[in-house]
Design a protein with these regions (language model features):
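Positively charged n-region of N-terminal signal peptides that target proteins for export
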Residues: 1-5
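Bacterial N-terminal signal peptides
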Residues: 8-18
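Metalloprotease/metallohydrolase-associated module, dominated by Zn2+-dependent proteases
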Residues: 38-110, 114, 121, 162-232
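Mid-length scaffold segments of soluble, non-membrane domains
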Residues: 105-106, 111-161
Length: 232
C-alpha cells in the first residue's frame, strides 16, 4: 500500500528592521513554528524564485508584531514542506505469526515556499530602502531553500535505511512520522542559527556591502546544490 505524507515541516518567520539597533530585538529574531503548531488551513505559496514587493500581500502584521509596525520594513513567512510526490509504503507480512506490518519510505524530499498572504510589506517604506529590504528577504528565502535542499539530501541517506515493523498500519505511520520529526528538528536547530547570524550581520546596521556578501554566498550555494534539487 503506497501512501502520501500529510505533514508540513515547519514555518520560518523573518523580517527587516527600519532602523539600526545596538542589539537585535527579541521580536525581530527569526522564528520557527514547529510541525504540530502550523495551522491546517495555511495558504499555499510558491517555490523559490526572485521576490517582488507585490509578493507581500498580508494587509497587516501578525498581532504580536503590530506594536512594532513602525520599526519593520518587511515581514516574510516562508515554509519548508514535504513535496507532493513524497510517499511511503506499508505492507502486510504474511510469513510472520502474529501478522505484522512493514513500513518503508519510497521517496522523501522537501521544498521551500514563500507564503504571500502571510507576508507583509510596509507601505511607508522609504524608496531608498526598497532594494535593501527586498534583498534582505530574498536572502532569508534563499537560506530556507538551502535548508530544504540539505534536508532532502539527508533524507535520502536516512530513509533508505529505515524499516518500521509494527502490529498495525497506524502504528507504522506514527513511528515513521516520529523519526521524521527528529530529522527535521536537527535540521531546524542548525538553520535557525544561520538565519540569526544573517540578521545579526545585516539588521543591526545598514550595510549594503555586508548584505551583498551574504547574497553572493547564498547564490553560489544555490548553484552548487541545484543538481540535488532537480533530483527530487
Amino acid at each position: 500500500m503506497r501512501n502520501r505524507f500529510f505533514l508540513y515541516a515547519f514555518l520560518w518567520l523573518a523580517l527587516t528592521l527600519v532602523a539600526a539597533c545596538a542589539q537585535l530585538p527579541e521580536y525581530a529574531k527569526p522564528r520557527t513554528i514547529q510541525i504540530d503548531q502550523i495551522p491546517k488551513d495555511i495558504p499555499s505559496g510558491f517555490t523559490y524564485r526572485q521576490l517582488t514587493p507585490e509578493d507581500f500581500r498580508a494587509p497587516s502584521l501578525p498581532e504580536n508584531l503590530s506594536t512594532h509596525r513602525e520599526n519593520i520594513n518587511a515581514y516574510t513567512a516562508t515554509q519548508i514542506r514535504i513535496t507532493a510526490d513524497s510517499n511511503f509504503s506499508i505492507t502486510r507480512r504474511f510469513l510472520e505469526d502474529p501478522i505484522d506490518y512493514l513500513g518503508r519510505i519510497n521517496h522523501l524530499a522537501f521544498e521551500a515556499v514563500m507564503i504571500p498572504n502571510h507576508s507583509w510589506w510596509n507601505p511607508k517604506i522609504k524608496a531608498a530602502m526598497v532594494g535593501y529590504a527586498l534583498q534582505h528577504e530574498q536572502i532569508h528565502f534563499a537560506l530556507t531553500e538551502l535548508a530544504a535542499r540539505k534536508l532532502t539530501r539527508d533524507a535520502r541517506k536516512w530513509a533508505s535505511n529505515l524499516s518500521v515493523i509494527k502490529e498495525t498500519p497506524q502504528q507504522v505511520y506514527a513511528e515513521i512520522v516520529q523519526h521524521l520529526k527528529g530529522l527535521i528538528k536537527s535540521a531546524m536547530e542548525a538553520n535557525q542559527k544561520r538565519h540569526l547570524k544573517f540578521d545579526e550581520d545585516t539588521s543591526l546596521f545598514y550595510s549594503p556591502s555586508w548584505q551583498a556578501w551574504w547574497l553572493e554566498m547564498v547564490t553560489e550555494e544555490l548553484k552548487q546544490t541545484e543538481s540535488g534539487k532537480l533530483g527530487r
